[in-house]
Design a protein with these regions (language model features):
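Conserved anchor residues at repeat-unit boundaries in beta-strand-based tandem repeats, strongest
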Residues: 1-6, 18-29, 41-52, 64-75, ...
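Intrinsically disordered, low-complexity segments enriched in Ser/Pro/Gly/Ala and basic residues
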Residues: 13, 28, 34, 57-59, ...
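Functionally constrained cores in energy, signaling, and assembly domains
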Residues: 24, 31, 50, 59, ...
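Aromatic (phenylalanine/tyrosine) cluster motif
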Residues: 50, 69, 128, 142, ...
Length: 340
């Protein structure tokens, strides 16, 4: 028309591409099909020589896009069916997923949320085929920021993330009722945190590599309390143990047992100060009894054992050998009046 292509027509390009469809004022405009030599194909609307409007684009790799275009770019709303079986439905901008959209993975996982320049960025929810779900913030296609992860086994984590790992402050509630609230690093408890056990025990203190490590306090459900050092999840180092029933221990520990030097004040007012081994008095130590008696010497497996001196409240003294709290072996007894 007026020496210009107008209406229906076919153009075969020198590079092997082919267009069949509408023309207006010498430009491709309207509805048409463009077949590329490399196997790509577009069927849809055109405007002033550009793919513009609604249409379907399929590439030689096997991917298919059905949706809106603007100036030769996927822009607006559209569905993208990937060769591998994944399907995206949502907003596009300049050939990239951008805005709200849903990606359904071939394995059954499904993400619904915000996209920016082809990456999950902002708020989004992913439902995993195994039953787990995450709802929260994303950055550069990774779980990153603040969000809640519901695990398929019933565990729940709510808190901060970085590069798909628990990092920063967060609360983990275990399916069995235990819970941890505190600091995380690379998916493990690390820093300061509080752990509440289903049995009623509560620990507050330092963590390292997912274990109680450093200084911390545990309040037991029965009213007992320990305040001191920990290592590899065990009471280890120096600390104070207080029993609700009465009595307390101040001293050294190893692997949850009194081990080293320490002082135990008993509920009956006896006081032992000395060495411990495997949670029992062992080595050398002194015990001052509430009735005024006193023993200073060797101990083994919690018993007076070996050599030692016993002084009773009356002033009588025994110096010699013992076996399991009984005077046994060589020894001498000195009475308060000087008799021997």
């Amino acid at each position: 028309k007026n020496d210009k292509r107008d209406g229906q027509g076919t153009l075969i390009y020198s590079n092997g591409d082919k267009y069949v469809g509408d023309w207006a004022n010498d430009q491709i405009s309207g509805d048409g099909i463009y077949s590329y030599k490399n196997g790509d194909r577009y069927d849809g609307q055109w405007k002033n020589g550009f793919i513009h409007g609604k249409g379907t684009f399929s590439n030689s790799a096997g991917d298919v896009y059905i949706g809106e275009f603007k100036n030769n770019k996927m822009s607006g709303w559209g569905n993208y069916i990937y060769k591998n079986g994944n399907i995206y439905e949502g907003k596009w901008k300049n050939d990239k997923r951008d805005g709200q959209g849903t990606l359904s993975y071939i394995n059954g996982d499904k993400y619904k949320g915000k996209w920016t320049k082809d990456k999950r960025i902002g708020d989004g929810t992913i439902n995993f085929v195994n039953g787990s779900t995450y709802d929260g913030e994303w950055k550069n296609d990774y779980i990153d920021g603040y969000g809640t992860f519901n695990y398929s086994n019933g565990d729940i984590y709510e808190g901060e993330w970085k590069n798909e790992k628990k990092e920063g402050q967060g609360t983990f509630t275990y399916f069995d009722g235990d819970s941890y609230e505190g600091e995380w690093k690379s998916n493990i408890k690390n820093g300061i945190g509080a752990f509440s056990y289903i049995n009623g025990d509560k620990y507050q203190g330092q963590w390292k590599n997912d274990k109680r490590d450093g200084t911390g306090v545990i309040n037991y459900a029965n009213g007992d309390k320990y305040d001191g050092h920990w290592k590899n999840d065990y009471i280890h180092g120096k600390g104070i143990f207080t029993s609700l029933a009465g009595g307390n221990y101040i001293g050294e520990w190893e692997s949850d047992m009194k081990d080293g030097h320490g002082t135990f004040s008993y509920v009956n007012d006896d006081i032992y100060k000395g060495q411990w081994k495997n949670d029992k008095r062992g080595g050398t130590g002194v015990i001052n009894y509430a009735n005024g008696d006193r023993y200073d010497g060797n101990w083994k497996n919690g018993h007076i054992h070996g050599k030692g001196t016993f002084l009773n409240s009356a002033g009588d003294k025994y110096i010699g050998e013992w076996e399991k709290d009984i005077k046994e072996g060589q020894g001498k007894f000195i009475y308060s009046n000087g008799d021997r």
